[in-house]
Amino acid sequence: MAVLSTIYSITRASTPTMASLTNDSPSPLPSSSPSKLPSPTSPSKKPLKLRQVSKQMGSQNQQRRGNKPSIAQIERAFGSGSYRDSEGEMDMNTVFDELLLGHANKFESKIEKKLREIGEIFVARTEPKLRSSGKPVLMFTIQWILPIWIMSLLVACGVIKLPFSIPFLDDLIM
């Protein structure tokens, strides 16, 4: 926001000096020494060029004053804020097409097609091994971990009383 206010103050400060120039008078150009300016008595073509330059600058200044950008345009130029139209209609269409049609309407390059095929081959080769390797883990969980967890829960709730008394365990449960 500080950048925007600085830009605005710089343009406001520089606009009145240029706007005060008339189209008929030559614009004062910055020069390093006053001797380089043409003398008004000597006949030369530079005053004519200076008049043309000042007329062009005057018309540009009028265009600048007439076309002040809005705050939204300034924010868009700096990239702050989000706008719906910046996403583009093409992106919206591809998402819509993928939801309805799957990948039937998607155009793939050769590299994308090759990567997809390699991925499908990798899944086809490794999936049966992963499915069979999950069975021992499931059986261990059902046979050992689940019964121990259920017994611990019943003891903690007080449904099952232990035949011995340990003060630490009693304090922990209660």
Curated annotation (Swiss-Prot):
Domain of life from the UniProt record: Eukaryota
UniProt subcellular location: Plastid, Chloroplast thylakoid membrane
Boundaries of the annotated transit peptide in chain numbering: 1-54
GO CC list: chloroplast; chloroplast thylakoid membrane; membrane; NAD(P)H dehydrogenase complex (plastoquinone)
GO biological process: photosynthetic electron transport in photosystem I
Observed phenotype of the null mutant: Impaired chloroplastic NAD(P)H dehydrogenase (NDH) activity, probably due to a reduced stability of the NDH complex.
Biased composition (Low complexity): 30-45
Bias-annotated ranges (Polar residues): 14-24, 53-64
Coiled coil: none
Main location: plastid
Keyword annotations of the record: Chaperone, Chloroplast, Membrane, Plastid, Thylakoid, Transit peptide, Transmembrane, Transmembrane helix
Region entry Disordered, spans: 14-71
Positions of transmembrane segments: 140-160
Membrane topology according to the record: Single-pass membrane protein
Annotated InterPro entries: CRR3
Function noted in UniProt: Probable subunit of the chloroplast NAD(P)H dehydrogenase (NDH) complex of the photosynthetic electron transport chain. Required for both formation and activity of NDH. May function in assembly or stabilization of the NDH complex.
Additional observations: CRR3 is not conserved in cyanobacteria and seems to be a subunit of the NDH complex which is specific to the chloroplast.
UniProt-recorded name of the protein: Probable NAD(P)H dehydrogenase subunit CRR3, chloroplastic
Annotated organism of origin: Arabidopsis thaliana
